[in-house]
Amino acid sequence: PQVRNRGTIGGSIANNDPAADYPAGLVGLGATVHTTKRQIPADDFFTGMFETALAEDEIVTAVAFPIPEKAAYMKFANPASRYAIVGVLVSKGKAGVRVAVTGAGPCVKFAADAVAGVKVASDGLNSDLHASAEYRANLVSVMLKRAVAAAAG
């Protein structure tokens, strides 16, 4: 019973739910996932909807994050589940500015174009009973602006 009622960051990222918050944190901060066999940059760890770079005989043992100068995460949550319909993490660190988007598509994504303020296209975004792809594309822009404002704070 105790295991069923508790979650971990490692378990959440290994599951890679496309609407989960942690993947955006890892990608947006440029984290490294440590496993029983290797270290995987977060940009390479999340490979598709509910898929990761983990081998069948590997588990997540730790996650290492560089400390950002500034960062903020904003999400538009599903009111029932609190999962992100769209979540955007913005960070500024030694490696520059990074933007990660979760909930909008089948997998968390490093959004290099968002850094430049390019409008997000709805092609390839999720469309379901919670939000259309077009609405999610608009939400990415809105959440990005809010995250930038919060990080600049």
Where are these regions (language model features)?
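C-terminal structural segment of proteins
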Residues: 1-153
